[in-house]
């Protein structure tokens, strides 16, 4: 009998140790550096142990069909079918730099050069030259519309319809001043009215993504802002945002803002600046690009209202690394700045930078995109930006793409999913973001 009792005690002790060890092992597990445990289709669980103490300082304001302002974050409307929503806290970067022979007399950007590496030894081991559309384009994917022209009204209409289907409420238009373009393109500022008209038709708003150009200074940006507001400020599609002070102001993203010293930006963006926009009819919400960690202080010192991350390659920079977003958001909250994380479906620019495969981020059938969106949402931002609708060179597009094989090229595609897979994922997460925000504000 004693022997049986001893065996029972030993068995009970071993079982207890097993349970204890299992619990400790589970407790010490950490997420991997790769994808999260979010399964496709699963909703985010509420953040445990975190409560929203107050409403956010910033609420979206959008112009209605007649240009009137209201403070809802979304607009629900019927368009010859069931009700659906557009969410003005989802902003998507959009490019107008493409051209085709039919509309522009030649291909523009689809025939992009293969950019050589700055180290001649590395450059020597990679191909040179430029792409030869329509079969060979400067992208690893192939658009359903083919190598199109951004001037084609049917293309613009198709794009706005796709963005509406994705439920993204704000197109962030890559913008250069009249007569100015990037080094591989041609001026396209004259297309802005057509984009705004098409966007308005689909209840989409338009914000401006100020691109760097030769000679860009605080003074030239002052003139750029004045031009944009004077020219487009009364359009029904012109996007405005309600600031923490209650003012309803245009919102501008400033790409490569770090190229200009913070003390120079301060002349434009602080109340005591020599040619300040603050308190004038040309005031706005100005969002700077954060790439390196030190840019946080520079952005604050420059008088900006917030920061965005843009790049869709997790780990490429301090700003684009998901693991840093919580700290960036905390800095922004402390200093009354907006933090606008940028989520993307993947990254692959080897069609234009053949030596840059170490920054490639595969899409994994949409898993990378959902992980990126989850990371953005987890820091409870006011706005999430999507990189991008149609930056085909860097493989960040969510625009419809199709399988394509030529004699020289085999393009990537969205299989096993349909061409609109990333539009559908965007809509799913836009809806989820709206529902999560409602919970945060309770």
From Swiss-Prot:
A single GO cellular-component term on record: Golgi membrane
UniProt-listed Pfam families: Glyco_hydro_99 (PF16317)
EC number(s) given by UniProt: 3.2.1.-
Membrane topology of the entry: Single-pass type II membrane protein
Positions in the Cytoplasmic compartment: 1-8
Record-linked Gene3D superfamilies: Glycosidases (3.20.20.80)
All ranges on the Lumenal side of the membrane: 30-442
The keyword Lyase is annotated on this UniProt entry: no
Keyword annotations: Golgi apparatus, Hydrolase, Membrane, Signal-anchor, Transmembrane, Transmembrane helix
Localization of this protein: Golgi apparatus membrane
One Gene Ontology MF term: alpha-mannosidase activity
TM region positions: 9-29
InterPro entries: Glyco_Hydrolase_99
Highest rank taxon of the organism: Eukaryota
UniProt cross-references to PANTHER family, sorted A to Z: ENDO-ALPHA-1,2-MANNOSIDASE, GLYCOPROTEIN ENDO-ALPHA-1,2-MANNOSIDASE-LIKE PROTEIN
The family this protein is said to belong to: Belongs to the glycosyl hydrolase 99 family.
Name of the protein in question: Glycoprotein endo-alpha-1,2-mannosidase-like protein
Source organism (scientific name): Danio rerio (Zebrafish)
Lineage start: Eukaryota, Metazoa, Chordata, Craniata, Vertebrata
Originating gene: maneal
């Amino acid at each position: 009998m004693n022997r049986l009792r001893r065996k029972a005690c030993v068995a009970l002790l071993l079982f207890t140790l097993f349970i204890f060890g299992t619990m400790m092992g589970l407790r010490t597990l950490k997420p991997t550096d790769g994808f999260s445990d979010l399964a496709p289709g699963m909703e985010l669980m509420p953040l445990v142990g975190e409560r929203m103490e107050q409403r956010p300082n910033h609420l979206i304001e959008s112009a209605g069909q007649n240009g009137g302002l209201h403070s809802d974050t979304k607009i629900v409307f019927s368009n010859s079918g069931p009700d659906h929503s557009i969410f003005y806290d989802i902003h998507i970067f959009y490019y107008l730099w493409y051209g085709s022979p039919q509309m522009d007399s030649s291909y523009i950007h689809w025939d992009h050069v293969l950019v050589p590496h700055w180290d001649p030894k590395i450059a020597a081991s990679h191909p040179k030259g430029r792409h030869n559309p329509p079969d060979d384009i400067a992208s690893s994917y192939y658009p359903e519309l083919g190598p199109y022209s951004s001037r084609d009204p049917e293309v613009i209409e198709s794009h706005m319809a796709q963005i509406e289907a994705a439920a993204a409420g704000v197109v962030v238009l890559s913008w250069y001043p009249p007569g100015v373009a990037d080094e591989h393109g041609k001026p396209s500022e004259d297309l802005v009215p057509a984009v705004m008209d098409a966007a308005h038709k689909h209840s989409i708003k338009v914000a401006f993504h100020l691109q760097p150009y030769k000679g860009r200074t605080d003074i030239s940006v002052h003139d750029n802002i004045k031009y944009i507001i004077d020219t487009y400020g009364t359009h029904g599609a012109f996007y405005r945002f309600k600031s923490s002070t209650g003012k309803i102001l245009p919102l501008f993203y400033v790409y490569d803002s770090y190229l200009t010293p913070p003390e120079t930006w301060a002349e434009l963006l602080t109340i005591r600046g020599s040619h300040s926009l603050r308190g004038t009819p040309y005031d706005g919400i100005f969002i700077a690009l954060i790439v390196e960690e030190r840019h946080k202080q520079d952005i604050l010192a420059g008088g900006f209202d917030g920061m965005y991350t843009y790049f869709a390659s997790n780990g490429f920079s301090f700003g684009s690394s998901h693991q840093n977003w919580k700290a960036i958001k905390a800095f922004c909250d402390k200093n009354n700045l907006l933090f606008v994380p940028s989520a993307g479906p993947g990254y692959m620019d080897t069609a234009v930078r053949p030596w840059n495969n170490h920054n490639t981020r595969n899409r994994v059938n949409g898993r990378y995109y959902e992980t990126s969106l989850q990371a953005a949402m987890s820091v409870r931002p006011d706005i999430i930006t999507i990189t991008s609708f149609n930056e085909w060179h860097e493989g960040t597009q969510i625009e419809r793409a199709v399988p394509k094989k030529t004699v020289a090229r085999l393009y990537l595609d969205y299989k096993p999913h349909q061409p609109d897979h990333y539009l559908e994922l965007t809509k799913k997460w836009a809806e989820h973001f709206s529902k999560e925000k409602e919970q945060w504000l309770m």
